[in-house]
């Protein structure tokens, strides 16, 4: 179920402060965040944000197409390595 329109999009306050500061001084260093639930805002376009995936911070360059999505959508938490082959079938 999507978020109510009367509430508006969510962004973590500390992340918003970091973004505003980086935009103000035109800083290009990646911003480190653990807030995967924050929505990408238009003023983030052009910044690099390192989003935590549970193990590492994954750097993500924000583009216009990402606006409105959550940061966690771009930092995958699970790796799929495929199913292992059956050893009995493999020997034939």
UniProtKB/Swiss-Prot annotation:
Which keywords belong to this entry? Ribonucleoprotein, Ribosomal protein, RNA-binding, rRNA-binding
- Out of the domains of life, which is the source? Bacteria
Read off the Pfam families from this record. Answer: Ribosomal_S19 (PF00203)
Name the Gene Ontology biological process terms. Answer: ribosomal small subunit assembly; translation
The name on file for this protein is: Small ribosomal subunit protein uS19
Answer whether the UniProt record assigns the keyword Acetylation to this protein: no
- Name the family the entry cites: Belongs to the universal ribosomal protein uS19 family.
Which species?
Buchnera aphidicola subsp. Schizaphis graminum (strain Sg)
Function of the molecule:
Protein S19 forms a complex with S13 that binds strongly to the 16S ribosomal RNA.
State if rRNA-binding is listed as a keyword: yes
Gene3D superfamilies, per database record: 30s Ribosomal Protein S19, Chain A
As recorded in Swiss-Prot or TrEMBL, the protein's gene is named: rpsS
GO cellular component terms given for this protein: cytoplasm; small ribosomal subunit
Molecular function (Gene Ontology), one example? rRNA binding
InterPro entries for the chain: Ribosomal_uS19, Ribosomal_uS19_bac-type, Ribosomal_uS19_CS, Ribosomal_uS19_SF
């Amino acid at each position: 179920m999507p978020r109510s329109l009367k509430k508006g999009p969510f962004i973590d306050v500390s992340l918003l402060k970091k973004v505003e500061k980086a935009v103000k001084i035109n800083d290009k260093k990646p911003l480190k965040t653990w807030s995967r639930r924050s929505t990408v805002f238009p003023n983030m376009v052009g910044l690099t944000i390192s989003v935590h995936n549970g193990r590492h911070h994954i750097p993500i360059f924000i583009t216009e197409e990402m606006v409105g999505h959550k940061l966690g959508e771009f930092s995958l938490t699970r790796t799929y390595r495929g199913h292992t082959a059956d050893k009995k079938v493999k020997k034939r």
